[in-house]
């Protein structure tokens, strides 16, 4: 089960529109970004910057069905 625990909208000119925390089962994932991309809105997983200056995902959803469900729930909550 996926639950949107918190959604914080960002009012600026950045492509990041909001930050979201979600609960997946007994796991809380903080810092998911809702981003306006070339093809519309999408959910970007939390990232951290490595010592090499590159950004790396800190959470990766391996199951495509779960990933799509997560994206759908997040965007549904954002569009309410």
Regions inferred by a protein language model and the residue ranges of each:
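Single-stranded nucleic acid-binding surfaces, predominantly the OB-fold ssDNA-binding core
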Residues: 1-80
């Amino acid at each position: 089960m996926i639950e949107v625990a918190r959604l914080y909208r960002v009012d600026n000119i950045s492509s990041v529109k909001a930050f979201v925390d979600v609960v997946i089962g007994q796991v809380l994932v903080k810092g998911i970004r809702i981003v306006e991309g070339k093809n519309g809105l999408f959910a970007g997983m939390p990232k951290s910057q490595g010592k090499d200056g590159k950004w790396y995902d800190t959470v990766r959803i391996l199951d495509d069905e779960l990933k799509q469900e997560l994206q759908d729930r997040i965007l549904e909550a954002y569009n309410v």
